[in-house]
């Protein structure tokens, strides 16, 4: 049983100064009326208190927030008697276990979860008033004894609840134990207070005090120091503990400090790759084990290596137990499926979804539903980088040989040369129709016009002071590498969207990279045609991280570029981020990238076929594409018409299987007004924003975050993707808050210059010297002082 006193925390500032007292009690009550949602979660997640209760004020927290509390360390909810209906709602509607909801009855809260104890109002004490004397009084007021000597039977256990010994306590020893925070008892043989370890050095840190169910015995939870509790130098007065997991942890901690260099355990600690490999090996052997004996044997091996990893990283079994305790408290649990790489892949026929191809529908007032709808897929950055890093390093070190090896491995094509040099052979244009040439020529010309208009024609000059002329002028980035994805679609449009601005900006060398076709080892003739039109010098016949690495570092036949641009899958993006941060590469990138996305805002007057076609044109990019429709005052009839149009059009598309899977996680969000819809769009920051609303042009001024905007019913995203003239290389994953889409300036850098006359030096020189002196940079100051002295602009004795 815990002590009947319940410390109340109404501000976290008081916690640190009183932490040791609360730890001794083992329970705490968080004041929900004073603490914020964030403060409650911070405390319950981070602080190791066995019992964390929360007083729940009426109406302050949403259902989702309350569930989050219970899922993250709050054990019980204390509810005032007048709010009994709240308790009913939690139990009946949210399926919160009844024992975790404590309703006040006659001024008493009867806690039933984890520990059974009644807490009266007078025992709920502000943490600010908590003191050692108060704790001593509570312990002595709770425990009783029928022994003639007035001593209290005391069981001493360690932090793992293992019995160390049976001793006795007196009132004075209890007071001293609380005062010192140490294991202090009463010695019957010496007839005096006994501070454990005072002479032997085997002391104890006191962690918690509690009583048994009848309050006639005490339990001290302690952290034992040095060799053990018993005078015979064993951990327990009942003999040594069985080795077990705690014993193994103790042994490994010792081995971490003193294992010989040639020992296997030392090798494991020194070689993390070996340790990780052994954990995976033993885990696999455990899954293959049969029968009780073999299973227990393989589990023991796995525990050994897992514990070695914990010890090597300063993680204790207690830390693991705390996590298990936290998970035990959860009232909602994960689905529990294994990661795809650990389960057999179902056949394609089994993967196909069935039924109508419809979007989910949520109201804007449903905050949880909206948050789910606007949430982007989680990028497993660390896992992806773990796969990408070796590829980059191998290409960097081995050049073409590594590139050819990866092309054969990942693209299924065995090449003798990874580079196609200009002028490109005629055979690479086979299959290119005149109709396609005309379409590409029109698109190239429109993109050229729009991007040429962005090209600065004059140097920017500003005279900031008389005689101080500042200027800024553009220069092309000399060598650029343009990544053209392959995969599930041929994308000559990406080639022209990147190649044309590079040509307009007058980059000296343009290098394409695109994965070769498995059928013949070539890239599509459309991509080669665009490469020729924009003056590309080379096409690297490779994709993925290996292509990025080849352009970033250069190989025997591939020039090192200064900037890499272009979309790609998560491996391409990870590789771009890697080389951008590697000073050896000295290579920048255009922007981070994620799955393609569209947000359409439509009202009751929107053409349902137009809306459906815009949604589907994005959905066919891939199953991870983001497709969101924000409806403004849509009727039920209109919503159904849109759903029907999506279904009927989708069935006509060759990539219907991809579309079906994408639409399965896509959503219609219903708003009450245009401003609310635009606010939601700005929060999401879509790659593509389509406005299919009345007077669409009037609302463009409300757009703050978007890659590109498509205004009005007759402006489908497809036009911007191919031929209108704007660029389709746009920021995704919410990066439209910080990044622009590709443009002419993307392929340029801007250099500043200044030209200062003697008059100008006189006007700004004293300011320069003043600031330089303050910063302690005398060299900077002297560079101005010497010039001004020679010009006679300052006295010779100027300091």
Swiss-Prot record:
Q: Which GO terms describe its molecular function?
A: ATP binding; histidinol dehydrogenase activity; metal ion binding; NAD binding; phosphoribosyl-AMP cyclohydrolase activity; phosphoribosyl-ATP diphosphatase activity
Q: Which reaction does it catalyse?
A: 1-(5-phospho-beta-D-ribosyl)-5'-AMP + H2O = 1-(5-phospho-beta-D-ribosyl)-5-[(5-phospho-beta-D-ribosylamino)methylideneamino]imidazole-4-carboxamide; 1-(5-phospho-beta-D-ribosyl)-ATP + H2O = 1-(5-phospho-beta-D-ribosyl)-5'-AMP + diphosphate + H(+); L-histidinol + 2 NAD(+) + H2O = L-histidine + 2 NADH + 3 H(+)
**From which source organism is this entry?**
Saccharomyces cerevisiae (strain ATCC 204508 / S288c)
Which GO cellular component terms are attached? cytoplasm
Q: What is this protein called?
A: Histidine biosynthesis trifunctional protein
Q: Which residues form the active site?
A: 687, 688
Q: Which biological pathway?
A: Amino-acid biosynthesis; L-histidine biosynthesis; L-histidine from 5-phospho-alpha-D-ribose 1-diphosphate: step 2/9; Amino-acid biosynthesis; L-histidine biosynthesis; L-histidine from 5-phospho-alpha-D-ribose 1-diphosphate: step 3/9; Amino-acid biosynthesis; L-histidine biosynthesis; L-histidine from 5-phospho-alpha-D-ribose 1-diphosphate: step 9/9
The entry's free-text remark on the cofactor is: Binds 1 zinc ion.
Miscellaneous notes = Present with 521 molecules/cell in log phase SD medium.
Annotated stretches, region: Phosphoribosyl-AMP cyclohydrolase = 1-229
Swiss-Prot/TrEMBL induction comment:
Induced by amino acid and purine starvation in a GCN4 dependent manner.
Q: Does the keyword Amino-acid biosynthesis apply?
A: yes
> Where is the stretch described as Histidinol dehydrogenase?
313-799
Q: Which GO terms describe its biological process?
A: L-histidine biosynthetic process
Q: Which controlled-vocabulary keywords does the entry list?
A: Amino-acid biosynthesis, ATP-binding, Histidine biosynthesis, Hydrolase, Metal-binding, Multifunctional enzyme, NAD, Nucleotide-binding, Oxidoreductase, Zinc
Question: Which Gene3D superfamilies does this one have?
Answer: 1.20.5.1300, MazG-like, Nitrogenase molybdenum iron protein domain, Phosphoribosyl-AMP cyclohydrolase
Cofactor needs: Zn(2+)
Q: Where does Zn(2+) bind?
A: 618, 621, 721, 780
EC number in record: 3.5.4.19, 3.6.1.31, 1.1.1.23
Keyword Oxidoreductase set for record = yes
Q: Where is this region: Phosphoribosyl-ATP pyrophosphohydrolase?
A: 230-312
InterPro entries attached here?
Ald_DH/histidinol_DH (IPR016161), HisE (IPR008179), Histidine_synth_trifunct (IPR016298), Histidinol_DH_CS (IPR001692), Hstdl_DH (IPR012131), PRib-ATP_PPHydrolase-like (IPR021130), PRib_AMP_CycHydrolase_dom (IPR002496), PRib_AMP_CycHydrolase_sf (IPR038019)
């Amino acid at each position: 049983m815990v002590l009947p006193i319940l410390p109340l925390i109404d501000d976290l500032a008081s916690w640190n100064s009183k932490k040791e007292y609360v730890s001794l009690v083992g329970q705490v009550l968080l004041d929900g009326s004073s603490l914020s949602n964030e403060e409650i979660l911070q405390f319950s997640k981070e602080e190791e208190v066995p019992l964390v209760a929360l007083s729940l004020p009426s109406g302050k927290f949403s259902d989702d927030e309350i569930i989050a509390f219970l899922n993250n360390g709050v054990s019980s909810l204390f509810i005032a008697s007048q709010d009994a209906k709240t308790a009913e709602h939690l139990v009946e509607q949210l399926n919160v276990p009844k024992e975790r909801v404590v309703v006040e009855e006659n001024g008493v809260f009867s806690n039933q979860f984890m520990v059974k104890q009644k807490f009266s109002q007078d025992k709920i004490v502000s943490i600010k008033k908590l003191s050692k004397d108060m704790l001593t009084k509570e312990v002595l007021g709770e425990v009783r004894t029928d022994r003639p000597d007035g001593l209290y039977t005391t069981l001493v256990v360690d932090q793992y609840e293992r019995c160390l010994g049976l001793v006795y306590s007196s009132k004075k020893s209890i007071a001293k134990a609380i005062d010192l925070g140490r294991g202090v008892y009463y010695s019957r043989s010496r007839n005096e207070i006994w501070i454990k370890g005072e002479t032997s050095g085997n002391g104890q840190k006191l962690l918690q005090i509690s009583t048994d169910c009848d309050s006639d015995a005490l339990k001290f939870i302690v952290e034992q120091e040095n060799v053990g509790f018993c005078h015979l130098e064993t951990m327990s007065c009942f003999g040594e503990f069985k080795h077990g997991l705690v014993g193994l942890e103790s042994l490994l901690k010792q081995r971490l400090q003193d294992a010989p260099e040639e020992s296997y355990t030392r090798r494991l600690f020194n070689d993390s790759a070996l340790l990780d490999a052994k954990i995976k090996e033993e885990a696999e052997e455990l899954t293959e084990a049969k029968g009780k004996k073999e299973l227990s044997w393989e589990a023991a091996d796995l525990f050994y290596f897992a514990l070695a990893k914990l010890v090597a990283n300063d993680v204790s079994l207690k830390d693991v137990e705390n996590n298990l305790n936290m998970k035990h408290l959860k009232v909602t649990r994960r689905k529990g499926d294994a990661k795809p790489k650990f389960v057999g892949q179902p056949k394609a026929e089994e993967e196909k979804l069935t039924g109508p191809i419809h979007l989910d529908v949520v109201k804007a007032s449903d905050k949880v539903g909206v948050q789910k709808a606007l949430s982007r897929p989680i990028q497993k950055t660390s896992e992806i980088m773990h796969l990408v890093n070796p590829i980059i390093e191998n290409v960097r070190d081995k050049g073409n040989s590594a590139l050819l090896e990866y092309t054969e491995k990942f693209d299924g094509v065995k090449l003798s040369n990874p580079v196609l040099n200009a002028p490109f052979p005629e055979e690479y244009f086979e299959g290119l129709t005149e109709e396609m040439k005309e379409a590409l020529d029109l698109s190239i010309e429109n993109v050229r016009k729009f991007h040429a208009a962005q090209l600065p024609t004059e140097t920017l000059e500003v005279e900031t002071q008389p005689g101080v002329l500042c200027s800024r002028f553009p220069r092309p980035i000399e060598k650029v590498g343009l990544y053209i994805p392959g995969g599930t679609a041929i994308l000559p449009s990406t080639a022209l969207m990147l190649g044309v601005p590079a040509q307009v900006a007058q980059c000296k060398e343009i290098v394409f990279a695109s994965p070769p076709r498995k059928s013949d080892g070539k890239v599509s003739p459309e991509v080669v045609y665009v490469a020729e039109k924009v003056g590309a010098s080379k096409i690297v016949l490779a994709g993925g991280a290996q292509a990025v690495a080849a352009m970033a570092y250069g190989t025997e036949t591939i020039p090192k570029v200064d900037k890499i641009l272009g979309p790609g899958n998560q491996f391409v993006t990870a590789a771009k981020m890697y080389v951008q941060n590697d000073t050896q590469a000295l290579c920048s990138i255009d922007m981070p990238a994620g799955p393609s996305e569209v947000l359409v805002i439509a009202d009751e007057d929107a053409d349902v076929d137009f809306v459906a076609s815009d949604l589907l044109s994005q959905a066919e990019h891939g199953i991870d594409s983001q497709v969101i429709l924000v409806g403004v005052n849509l009727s039920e009839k209109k919503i159904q018409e849109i759903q029907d149009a999506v279904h009927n059009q989708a069935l006509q598309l060759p990539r219907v299987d991809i579309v079906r899977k994408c639409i399965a996680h896509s959503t219609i969000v219903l708003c009450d007004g245009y401003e609310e819809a635009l606010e939601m769009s700005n929060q999401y920051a879509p790659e593509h924003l389509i406005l299919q609303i009345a007077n669409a042009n009037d609302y463009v001024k409300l757009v703050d975050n978007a890659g590109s905007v498509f205004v009005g019913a007759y402006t489908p995203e497809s036009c911007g993707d191919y031929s209108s003239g704007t660029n389709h290389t746009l920021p995704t994953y919410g990066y439209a808050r910080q990044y622009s889409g590709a443009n002419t300036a993307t392929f340029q850098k801007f250099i500043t210059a200044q030209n200062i006359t003697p008059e100008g030096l006189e006007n700004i020189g004293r300011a320069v010297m003043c600031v330089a002196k303050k910063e302690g940079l005398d060299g900077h100051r002297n560079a101005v002082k010497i010039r001004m002295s020679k010009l006679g602009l300052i006295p010779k004795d100027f300091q």
